[in-house]
Amino acid sequence: MSFLKLFKQFVVTGFNKKLLFLSETTCWSYEIQPDLPLEKCRPKKYFDADSDSDEESTQQPQKPPTNGNGTADNVQIVALEVHEGKSLLAVATSDKSLFLFAIDPEGDETNKDRLKLLSRRMVSRTSSCMKFAASGKFLVVCDKGGDCYRYDCDDDDCKKPGRWLLGHMSQVLDVLVPDNERFIITSDRDEKIRVTNHPDCHSIETFCLGHGEFVSQLEFVTAKDGKSRLLSLSGDKTLRLWDYETGKEVARKELSHPGNRFAVKQLLDGTLLVAVLFYEPTEMAIYKLTEVESLTSETIQTLKTNQNEVFSSFAFDERNNLLSLVVDKVTEKISLKWYQFEQENCKFNDLTPNPLEKLFFDNTENDKISYVDSVSFLFKKKFDNLKDYQERKRRRIVEGGKYNYGGRM
């Protein structure tokens, strides 16, 4: 797995155990150490989430978790988020750890002061997604079991255990927190988008229902009336717009293939640029949405990878350029692509070579990353039980015919 985020003038990438901060002139790296100190408190489950007692305070300090085979050698980054306002970086790893760092890009050249570890806390299961609240006061972490936890990020609370917020019956694939922090919005493998009140998460505000397959990603967009809407992407080949406070579907756009991930950039005139990565991650379609409320759009470009390569993580920068990590499935090499936005013709040009690409290559030349198909298993499994029943019935009739009239044939 690999991740790409933007933080001020830096492009932040994460894969294996490695973090890279890149600008056009500099690059510095950090490697997650599995033996870093671990807070002794476990996350509070649903049955004690409302309790203020620190029932874990008497426990012995926890041993660093492992990857399941007794070692921490193969620990990998499974989720990554940044908060620009508070200069925070959150990293979840495969050993069920949540690292919270303070970022100081002006630190010394040894990188020791550029990333300061604030805490390493435990999560109940392997994380599937996470998001910072707009204020940066807390982080919502969701796991593959369907549970969502709140982890405080303020200086005084950043070492406290996670507190259970809500749960789904299936894997949570994405989570959002609006600016007013009134809701926690989650999507899951079972086609549902759930809008839960916050902090009273026992109360569900509404569901946004209509997708026929897993809902892989969510994003807020702003309509012309200034109201916030919810954009969702699904494996049912649709992109949908919702009034998430009422659960009403506002508009939908049919896609040519099941959706995997997307990136959204809203221009000053209200136009949306939406880059959609399909189920087969060798193609990325870029749409220009001129009317947000109706999802009126045109396909302005389709980007394709070279042979054996697949798009991984991608994002728009502040200049509307598109940045993407690309993985070669054969050589297991990872590279960074930079597509420059040409506003006059509304298209993206592949800038190869470019300073970012070279810096990334120089700092990852000896790294390898295995490509993992994380989408196929999300589709609903279909079983044709009727056909099996009819076949068994036919066999019984054929076999029963041998003993008609009480005699042998």
Swiss-Prot record:
GO terms for cellular component: cytosol; nucleus; tRNA methyltransferase complex. Forms a heterodimer with the catalytic subunit. Required for the formation of N(7)-methylguanine at position 46 (m7G46) in tRNA. In the complex, it is required to stabilize and induce conformational changes of the catalytic subunit. It is found in: Nucleus. Belongs to the WD repeat TRM82 family. Residues 48-72 are annotated as: Disordered. InterPro entries: Trm82, WD40/YVTN_repeat-like_dom_sf, WD40_repeat_dom_sf, WD40_rpt. HAMAP family: TRM82. Residues 58-72 have a biased composition (Polar residues). WD repeats lie at residues 72-111, 122-161, 167-206, 210-252. It comes from the Eukaryota. GO terms for biological process: tRNA (guanine-N7)-methylation. This is tRNA (guanine-N(7)-)-methyltransferase non-catalytic subunit wuho. Pathway: tRNA modification; N(7)-methylguanine-tRNA biosynthesis. Transmembrane segments: none annotated. Keywords: Nucleus, Repeat, tRNA processing, WD repeat.
